[in-house]
Amino acid sequence: MSKIIGIDLGTTNSAVAVLEGTESKIIANPEGNRTTPSVVSFKNGEIIVGDAAKRQAVTNPETVISIKSKMGTSEKVSANGKEYTPQEISAMILQYLKGYAEDYLGEKVEKAVITVPAYFNDAQRQATKDAGKIAGLEVERIVNEPTAAALAYGMDKTDKDEKILVFDLGGGTFDVSILELGDGVFDVLATAGDNKLGGDDFDQKIIDFLVAEFKKENGIDLSQDKMALQRLKDAAEKAKKDLSGVTQTQISLPFITAGSAGPLHLEMSLSRAKFDDLTRDLVERTKTPVRQALSDAGLSLSEIDEVILVGGSTRIPAVVEAVKAETGKEPNKSVNPDEVVAMGAAIQGGVITGDVKDVVLLDVTPLSLGIETMGGVFTKLIDRNTTIPTSKSQVFSTAADNQPAVDIHVLQGERPMAADNKTLGRFQLTDIPAAPRGIPQIEVTFDIDKNGIVSVKAKDLGTQKEQHIVIKSNDGLSEEEIDRMMKDAEANAEADAKRKEEVDLKNEVDQAIFATEKTIKETEGKGFDTERDAAQSALDELKAAQESGNLDDMKAKLEALNEKAQALAVKMYEQAVAAQQAAQGAEGAQANDSANNDDVVDGEFTEK
């Protein structure tokens, strides 16, 4: 089998690795660098990728950076006189990585394992897979970045049982995963994250500071000058990196713009203390996902054996100190944070080809999945942090008599009401035979494959007719939305519970009215008029309460109706039992007569 390369398709930088024997090796790019900037530029119809594209970003406005942040959305970028989807731009980066991997290996590369942030949703994962296809790669597996990092870290520790926390702060995303390692099994216990937090945000804080200081001194807003802004971005990134090794750095940008008196220059010094102050809120945001992942995994900090740092942004001293303070542990520095994800992806490629033996990777889905049910309730079928691949089915029914079709509204999120979660897709199951509500049996099945990509099937168990959909959303879940889902779920827990209680009560009332009306109709002319009249009276009162919308009144009248309906049901049961006993008595008498007749024997009498 041909080699399967491992690719870390990052926001700011990407890397490619391959398994050589039992070792995972990073492949250097044509410029000798072990990581490649995730930058694409267009010049005179030529596509330029990587270091060369990044170098000309200041002077070439047709340069695309951080395209990963747009994956899974319908947003396009304009360049080279065309409009490109995020998948197409990402494919250009993948093609470049594939090309120099082929040069190194001396053979054609057709298959890859590509990593994504653990908190990437279905649309973003599908977009990544599509980008691979456009680049001419068969994507054998989509692997979560922290999981790939754990795979690379733990490959030489398969005889050791330990629980690790992977802290992955990259250029545009942040993930935390808790894994249990032992006997070659890499089991993800929980994952959490913030898809709108990364090194780019730290750069932006410096840019905003420089723009504000320059405006204060010169009265000119550099953020309105596209070329000046690109120079500021480059300077901010360099300053951030410098401050990981020194306590102060000088930012010098001559001829940044021109004023009425002539050219203006930006000269400023930035201390690590000032940088820490500017980015304090970003560092603070890393703490919540750490706590969330630990809580979901059901572990305390004392049960974590190692903390692994992944992503270039974990070199920021304030981030390292925050990790120490939050976990109470010195981070393990045995892996290269820029390379470990691609190396883990290559190891997974080796698992697929059979070159790596006795390794099992058990990943999870980051958010709950389900459908909208009556009253706008979000009914979960698969909970977050469920090991994938997985499949779950549940039977639902119709909400009205003779309902010919059901709409299946597929959602992703953590809130109890459908409106507060993210729509992944909708489809319809039609031609349901006419029947009273609650009679048709509609089985809804969710499947999540090994790549975390969702497919949903609805089947009428009566007719065996089914509809199937692979979720392909054009506007995937944004980073803010994922973060908001988790935070809103906590902040609005009380309000959510109340709203759900209201919907549940209304559904219960609706069901009770339907069932009681049916019982009253079925018992017409069968006696026990007293109980029927009492049930009818309670039914009328509940309908009036339902009309008024008063929840307390509805609750009280529902209890009263249940009591009267129960009394009617008891009478029906007693009548049925009496009828059954009477029937059994009649059968018994008939059997006795037959038995008595059997005792009579005809015989001859002889007189002596």
UniProtKB/Swiss-Prot annotation:
Any one Gene Ontology molecular-function term assigned to this protein's record: ATP binding
Database matches in InterPro entries: ATPase_NBD, Chaperone_DnaK, Heat_shock_70_CS, HSP70_C_sf, HSP70_peptide-bd_sf, Hsp_70_fam
Modified residues (Phosphothreonine): T173
Recorded superkingdom: Bacteria
Start-end of Acidic residues biased regions: 599-608
One Pfam family from the record: HSP70
Keyword set, alphabetical order: ATP-binding, Chaperone, Nucleotide-binding, Phosphoprotein, Stress response
NCBIfam families from the UniProt entry: PRK00290.1, prok_dnaK
Protein task: Acts as a chaperone.
Family membership: Belongs to the heat shock protein 70 family.
Protein name: Chaperone protein DnaK
UniProt organism field: Streptococcus pyogenes serotype M28 (strain MGAS6180)
